[in-house]
Amino acid sequence: MNCLNAARLPFSEFSFTNLYLFRDVHDYYISGTECRILIDGITRDHVHYAMPLFDISLIGGEELEKIIRDNGVLFPVHESQLHLFSPDKYEWSYSHDDSDYLFTRDKLIHYPGRNLHKKRNLLKQFLEGYEWRSEPLTSERSADAQKILSDWQKGTGLADSETDYLSCHEALNHIESFNLTGCVIYVEDALAGFVLGEMISPNVFALHFAKCNTRFKGIYQFIYNHYAKELSPECEWINFEQDLGIPALRQAKETYEPDMMAHKYRVKLKD
C-alpha cells in the first residue's frame, strides 16, 4: 500500500507521484510533526490548504481544529469523515472539478449494459481490425511511450504547459523510481498507445496517464479493457482521477459511467 495513504482513501492525491509531478502547480511543502505529517499546498483556484498524511479520525477534536485554524482549509476530506466535524463550528463543500472518477475493474473488463454498448462495439472493432501486442511499460520502453506522448501533444494543438504533457514526460523518465506500472500497445509494430499508473491503496489503482493514437479505432476502449485484465484481482477499483473542469475531459470520463465519484471536501472553520 502507498505509505502516504494511511486512511486508505481512494483519492489520487495520496500518491508520491502526483505530489512530485504537480509540486509546482500546487506549491507543495511538508509541515507538521513526525507523527502528524501535513502537505501544505494551493488549490487550482488559489486556496491554501493542508492535506493530512494520517488518519484524521485518530486524533482529537482540538488538534484537528488547530490544524484547520493554522492552515485555513483541510483538503481533501472524504464524505465518510465529515461526521468528525460539527456543523455548528465547521462548513464544508466540494467542487466537481476536483472529484475523482472511479470504475470497478469488472466494468472495464466487460463494459456491461446498454449504455456501454458503444464501448463494446469499439472494443470489438479494434480486436477484429488489428494485429496487436502489449508490452510492460518499463524504462526500456519509455522512449516508445515518449514518442506516443509527443505525437499526442502535437495533435492537441496546445502549448505543452496547457496539457499534462510535461508531468507525463517527467513520469516516463522515472517509471521505476516512482514504482509505476503500465503497458505499451503496438499495432503491427506501430506505436498505438500506453497507460501508466500505480496502486494507491490495497484495492485502488490510479490511472495517471493514458495516451493513444486515435487513428487506431477503438484504441482507448481496448487499452482500458486490456489493462484492467492485467491488474491483480485484488484491485477492485480503477481511479481515472479528476477532470479539472475541462469540458472535453469530463465528457470523456462520464461516457464510461463511473461507479463512484470520490468527492473531495474542503473543510474550514465558520467565520
Language-model regions: role of each:
Residues A143, K147-H208:
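A mid-sequence, solvent-exposed acidic-amphipathic segment
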Residues S12-Q81, Y186-T214:
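Conserved donor-binding loop and adjoining core beta-sheet/short helix segment
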